[in-house]
Amino acid sequence: MTATVYTFTDKPATVTHTHTASGKPTRTEMYTYSYNHADRLLKVEHTLGGTKITLADYAYDNLGRLQSKSLHGSATNKLTYAYNVRGWLTGISGTKFTQNLYYNTGNGTARYNGSISSMTWKAGNESTVRGYKFTYDGLDRLLNATYGETAGINANTDRFSENVTAYDKNGNIKTLQRYGQTAASGYGLIDNLTFTLAGNLLNRVDDAAAASAYGGGFEFKDGVKQANEYTYDSNGNLTKDLNKGISTITYNVLNLPNMVTFSDGSTIAYTYGADGTKLKTVHKTGSTTTTTDYCGNVVYENGVQKLLLTDEGYVTLSDSKYHYYLKDHQGNNRVVINQSGTVEETNHYYPFGGVFASSGNVQPYKYNGKELDAKKGLNWYDYGARHYDAALGRFTTVDPSAENYYSTSPFTYCLNNPLNYIDPLGTDTVDVKDVDWNKFDPKKDVVALDEVAVSVPNALTKVGTRALEPISGFWGYVGYYLLDIGSTYHSEQTRFTYKVGTDGVITGVAPMVGTPPLPGFAKTSNLNTIRGLWSLTKQGSSKVMKHPIRGLFYKSKSDGLWWVKDQTKHGGSFYKVYKETNKGLEWHKDADKYGNFIINKHKSDVGIFIPWKELSK
């Protein structure tokens, strides 16, 4: 049971959880939240068993950006954050974790489009500074992640490099090379993979690498040599993975796995709520059965309360000790410390999410903060709507928002740019620069509103500001709105209202009352009209047409203009906008990702006119 008390500005002041289970002790916990005058979170306190502690203290700079975070009320457990003039995160520094991000500076090839060109980090009790240099192709897909050590990323190079040497025309990885630890003091090529596909479906993977990862560490396991090592059902769900020894996978109506059966008789069974929330997993291997129950933020193992997940980490219920995550720019759990600041786990990640052989295994929440199920060599990350196989850089099932990503395979991870994007719930791709992952909790910061779900403002970083890329439903790629200070935004399609604080930061969502002044667009409560991007999907448009190369064109209900996602994004363009004529569609303007027309931008002859004969329903 959960009880919430709100402030006068609709922010949670206290949240009380009462956990009950038959035959188990009742546990009551309470979160207390404190805010500044701009409704920014200043402090989170946690009360368990009558004892109150400070989970985290937050401080902000003059632009409202997170400046520092102190864990467990200790300055020793403090992280500070640095930004460039564009507001992009450039550094995280603390005694147990440090990270530096470089865009157009540093040791890599300069990038001016916001993609990270190189990064360095130092984690836990290690003295080694590690790093990657990144190169991308013309579609901003990752090609090479070249590993090195020291601040110059020029020592012990290639020890943990990861390179995609070819993509197909749909964006599926065709060949991939991965380096790693092969012996106590040896390093080399551990994966040299060739993917065989039928369209977007994976048929087989061949590994030409001679060496294996040291100590059974992360790598692709080439278990068989057959023509069809992977099979799928009619919904595009993976039903067999012979390389992992999986003989069958069955699914429920939500395309979530019910049962994974291995060839040796071992099984993994899943139980979900009606909304797809995972409630239970049962792992059976031989005579050993491990049952994990997820009851809110309490995790039971074999009927015993094991973990209580908090805003900043977890509590081990056997001893009531607090443990904290130190996260990088993507929300990856890099270091786990206890309440005294002692390092308990250190994790290093390949770009596509695999963990180095030297990483720890104290707790299962790793890449993007997602639970890694490594039992029986499954090695899947649970993203909620889908599972992700980091060894292959692919999801195991089709993207639920596949109609909005017409130009790429529905199995790809983050448009093949895993350094600069993340997928919070397995349903959409989000630029990491738009979200403060140190404050984002997918269970608390995402609220379902009928057919859509949006991130609430706690996770937003920028003043002026925008909603997070849509998590699910019919918003498609859009979901960004420019809002005036002190205003509210009404949406007819989604039936809710954004409330905006005095600094322009969204402060809450609430059900929409009444009829918006202009359906499909936005209007602030103080009558200052703003342009709201309508849904680039069938539900949000009056007509949809398909082009064999450019994808889906959507006709606006309000002004009759046709919108299509710009696949090249040259000059900051996110959308091509066309006017309708008798003979076809004539280019009108380019628009940025907020829906604003780009002034004084000229169009080449390519795609300036689309005849009707090239479009189909």
In which residue ranges do the predicted regions lie?
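Extracellular, surface-exposed repeat architectures
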Residues: 81, 85, 89-107, 199-209
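Residue-level markers of secondary-structure register and packing in elongated scaffolds
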Residues: 1-16, 24-38, 42-43, 51-70, ...
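Short turn/helix-capping motifs enriched in Asx and small/polar residues
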Residues: 340-354, 376, 384-386, 390-453, ...
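Surface-exposed acidic, glycine/proline-enriched linker/cap segments
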Residues: 67, 108-118, 157-158, 207-227, ...
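A motif-centric feature for acidic-aromatic and gly/ser/thr-rich catalytic loops and repeats
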Residues: 8, 97-105, 109, 195, ...
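Amphipathic, interaction-prone secondary-structure segments
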Residues: 545-576
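Hydrophobic, gly/ala-rich membrane-insertion helices/peptides used by toxins and envelope proteins
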Residues: 429-434, 438-533, 537
